[in-house]
Regions:
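Short, structured secondary-structure elements
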Residues: 2, 37, 55-58, 70-281, ...
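Periplasmic c-type cytochrome electron-transfer domains
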Residues: 19-25, 45-59, 258, 271
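C-terminal capping alpha-helices of c-type cytochrome domains
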Residues: 45-69, 161, 301-304
Length: 643
C-alpha cells in the first residue's frame, strides 16, 4: 500500500521498503516501475509511466520523499458544490460570464464536470477573461490622447492574440521581452514605452521581475531597498538588459543622501549607486538560473533574448512556480505564496504542492490551460463556499466568498441579460487627423477589458465619451483602473457604498433594467407560455439557479396580474417613424473646439442616460412590474461574488 508514509516505508514481504528516502535506486517501487517483467511491473494495468513521471518520482525519493502529515480528524471539509453552482463558478472563472440557458440545459442533460471544463478551456472567451489580469500585471497603460506619465503603447492586441492562441508562457515572455512589432498599433513594442519616464527600462524591470519572478524591486528604482535584499545596482543591470545597452543612472533616479543625513539620524535607506554611474547589462538573479541558461538564447548577442532565456529556462524553477502560483491564486482566491508578486515577503504554505505545480507546468509545455485543467478538476476547487470565511482556508478545506473582477461583473451583467455591449469607439480622433504618437484608436469594444481611461488634458465636455464613461464608472467602483502607471497583482476588493449605488441608480443600471426590443429578457417574456416556467427560466438565465420557495411565491404574486395578456398584438403596435437620412453629426479632436461640438456631445450624453426606448411588444403595466423584478435580481449580492 502507498496511501500512507508508514505503509510505503514498510513495503511488502518480499521486496522490502517500497520507498527508501534519499535512495531511489534502493526503493522497491522504482525497481517495479522500471521492471521489464510483466508480472512485477508497476502499474500492472494501463499505460506505463512516462520518462518525465519517472524522473519526478526519482527526484522526490532522492530529495527525502517528504510526506507531510495533517491531522485529518481535525479538519472539516465542505462538500462539493451542487451542479448549477459549479457551473456558474467555472464559467465565470474561465470565460468571465455565466452560462446561457442553452448551455445550462445541455449540462443538465449530461452533468459531466470534466467535459464542461474541457469545453470551456477551448472557448475563445478564455482570452477575454484573462485580459484584465495581465493588463494589471504588465501595466498596459495606453492613453487615447497625448501621453502622460508611464503611458505605454496598446500592446493589448498582441496580449489578446497570445491568450487566444494559448501561447506557451515561455514563448509569451520571450516575445514580450523582445518588444518587437508596432508601438502604437498593438504589438509588444508598445510594452517598451514608458512616456515621461527618465529611465523607461528601469520601470519595465520592476514589472518583469514581479510578473515572472516574484521579485519586488520598486524601491530599488531610487535607492537600495530597506525591506528587500535587492540593490539599485540589480535593477539597473536588469534595465540595461532590457535596453540592450549600458544605462547611466540619472540624478532624478537617486535619493539625495546629503539631505537625508541632514537630520543627524541614521537613514533607513542607502544609496550605493551614484548618479552618473554607467551600468552594464547583467543577469542579477543567479540564485534562479546560472549562466548556462543563457545558451538557450536564440541570439546570444541580444541581451533581451538572453534575459528571456534566463527567465524561461527549465532550470529556473522560480519562473514556473511564480506563474503556476498566479494561476492557482486566480482560481482559488489566494496563492500558495502571498503576495504572489513578492516571494521574499511570503513563503509557500504548501511547498511540496508548489514544487509539484511548477514541475507540472514545465512538463505540460508552460501551458496555462493544462495547469488550469488540473486545478479546476480538483476537489479543492469544487468544494462549497463557506460564507463565514473572509479568506480561503490555508488548507483549502473550503473556498471563501471571492469577489469577482470588475470586468467579470460588468460582462456577466450584459451577457446574462442579453443586452448588447454598445459604446462609442475608444478614440477621440475618429477622423484620424492626428499623429499616432498623440492619438490612438483602440476600436469598438465588445468586452469591458477593451476600455481605457477617458481623462484627457483638455477636460472639455466635447471630448466626453458618455457611454464608455458610464461603463467605466461601474468598473472603477469595483476596482478597475483606467490608468495603470504601475503594475498590481491584486486589486482592492473591499466593499464600498458606491458599488450598490452605481448599479441600482447609474446609467448602466438603466440600460440593463429597461426592457427594450434588444433585451434578452424581453425575448424570454415574449416566448414563455407559463408564468411558473418563466420565473424559473429568469432565475436560471440571470443567477444560474432556481428560485427559492419564498422567491417563487413573491415573484409569482408580483407578475401574475396581466401575465396572460402581457403580449401586445402586432396590429396594436404603432410603427416606428422612418429613420431620417440626415447625416449624424460627430465630434472629434479636429472639431471639438467648435461650439456645436459641445451641443452634440451633450445631446449624446442625455441619450446615453435615457437609454433605449422600452419595447412596445409588452403591456406597459406588466412590463414595469417585470422591470422591478429585473432591478431586484440584478442588484443581488450574487453578482459580485463567485458562488
Amino acid at each position: 500500500r502507498l496511501d500512507s508514509l508508514a505503509d510505503a516505508l514498510k513495503g511488502g514481504k518480499s521486496d522490502g521498503a517500497a520507498i527508501e528516502p534519499g535512495k531511489a535506486d534502493h526503493s522497491a517501487m522504482m525497481a517495479r516501475i522500471l521492471s521489464d517483467d510483466e508480472d512485477e511491473v508497476m502499474p500492472p494495468k494501463g499505460k506505463p509511466l512516462t520518462k518525465d513521471e519517472i524522473a519526478l518520482l526519482t527526484t522526490w525519493i532522492n530529495e527525502g520523499a517528504n510526506w507531510p502529515e495533517i491531522q485529518a480528524d481535525h479538519l472539516t471539509l465542505t462538500p462539493l458544490t451542487d451542479d448549477l453552482t459549479f457551473l456558474r463558478r467555472v464559467y465565470i472563472d474561465t470565460i468571465g460570464v455565466p452560462p446561457s440557458l442553452e448551455e445550462i440545459a445541455a449540462f443538465q442533460k449530461n452533468p459531466d464536470r470534466k467535459a464542461v471544463i474541457d469545453t470551456l478551456l477551448t472557448d475563445a472567451r478564455w482570452a477575454d477573461n484573462w485580459m484584465g489580469y495581465w493588463q494589471d500585471v504588465l501595466a498596459e497603460n495606453p492613453n487615447m490622447l497625448n501621453p502622460t506619465l508611464n503611458n505605454t503603447g496598446p500592446f493589448r492586441w498582441w496580449l489578446y492574440e497570445s491568450l487566444q492562441d494559448n501561447k506557451p508562457m515561455d514563448f509569451f515572455v520571450t516575445e514580450l521581452l523582445r518588444m518587437k512589432g508596432s508601438e502604437r498599433q498593438g504589438g509588444p513594442a508598445g510594452f517598451a514605452i514608458a512616456s515621461q519616464n527618465d529611465v523607461p527600462m528601469a520601470a519595465k524591470g520592476t514589472i518583469v521581475s514581479t510578473a515572472f519572478l516574484g521579485v519586488e524591486m520598486k524601491c530599488a528604482r531610487c535607492h537600495d531597498s530597506p525591506t528587500h535584499k535587492w540593490l539599485q545596482q540589480d535593477l539597473f543591470e536588469l534595465a540595461a538588459m532590457l535596453g540592450t545597452k549600458e544605462i547611466a543612472v540619472p540624478k532624478t533616479s537617486s535619493v539625495p543622501m546629503d539631505k537625508i543625513h541632514a537630520g543627524g539620524r541614521k537613514p533607513l535607506i542607502q544609496v550605493t549607486l551614484q548618479p552618473g554611474t554607467k551600468v552594464q547589462p547583467k543577469w542579477p538573479f543567479d540564485e534562479f538560473a546560472d549562466e548556462s541558461a543563457a545558451k538557450l538564447a536564440e541570439d546570444a548577442n541580444d541581451s533581451r533574448d538572453v534575459l528571456a532565456a534566463m527567465i524561461t529556462a527549465p532550470q529556473n524553477e522560480r519562473f514556473a512556480q511564480v506563474t503556476a502560483n498566479r494561476i492557482w491564486a486566480r482560481f482559488m482566491g489566494r496563492g500558495i505564496v502571498e503576495p504572489v508578486e513578492d516571494w521574499e515577503k511570503g513563503k509557500p504554505t504548501h511547498p511540496e504542492l508548489m514544487k509539484w505545480l511548477g514541475r507540472e507546468f514545465v512538463r505540460g509545455g508552460y501551458d496555462m490551460k493544462n495547469l488550469a485543467r488540473i486545478i479546476l478538476n480538483s476537489q479543492a476547487y469544487q468544494r462549497s463556499t463557506d460564507s463565514t470565511l473572509k479568506l480561503p482556508s490555508p488548507l483549502y478545506t473550503s473556498p471563501a466568498p471571492r469577489r469577482l473582477y470588475a470586468e467579470q461583473i460588468v460582462d456577466s451583467l450584459f451577457a446574462a441579460t442579453g443586452k448588447p455591449f454598445h459604446t462609442e469607439e475608444v478614440c477621440l480622433d475618429i477622423d484620424n487627423q492626428r499623429d499616432l504618437k498623440n492619438s490612438i484608436n483602440m476600436g469598438k469594444p465588445h468586452r469591458s477589458w477593451m476600455l481605457t481611461s477617458t481623462s484627457n488634458e483638455r477636460d472639455r465636455p466635447s471630448l466626453a465619451l458618455p457611454r464608455i464613461q458610464a461603463v467605466a464608472d461601474v468598473l472603477s467602483a469595483f476596482g478597475w483602473r483606467g490608468s495603470r502607471q504601475d503594475p498590481i497583482s491584486k486589486r482592492d476588493a473591499d466593499p464600498n457604498v458606491l458599488q450598490p449605488a452605481i448599479l441600482s441608480n447609474g446609467t448602466v443600471g438603466v440600460w440593463l433594467t429597461r426592457l427594450s426590443d434588444d433585451h434578452g429578457v424581453t425575448a424570454l417574456a415574449l416566448q414563455e407560455e407559463s408564468l411558473d416556467h418563466f420565473i424559473d427560466q429568469l432565475f436560471l438565465k440571470l443567477l444560474t439557479r432556481k428560485p427559492t420557495e419564498q422567491e417563487k411565491k413573491a415573484y409569482t404574486q408580483h407578475l401574475s396580474e396581466g401575465f396572460a395578456s402581457r403580449i401586445v398584438p402586432a396590429s396594436d403596435i404603432r410603427p416606428l417613424p422612418a429613420p431620417t437620412r440626415e447625416r449624424e453629426k460627430y465630434v472629434s479632436w479636429s472639431n471639438h473646439l467648435d461650439g456645436e461640438a459641445t451641443t452634440v456631445r451633450m445631446a449624446q450624453e442625455a441619450a446615453a442616460r435615457k437609454g433605449e426606448p422600452p419595447t412596445a411588444k409588452l403591456n406597459t403595466e406588466w412590463r414595469n412590474r417585470l422591470e422591478d423584478v429585473l432591478w431586484a435580481l440584478l442588484n443581488a449580492p450574487e453578482w459580485a461574488f463567485s458562488p
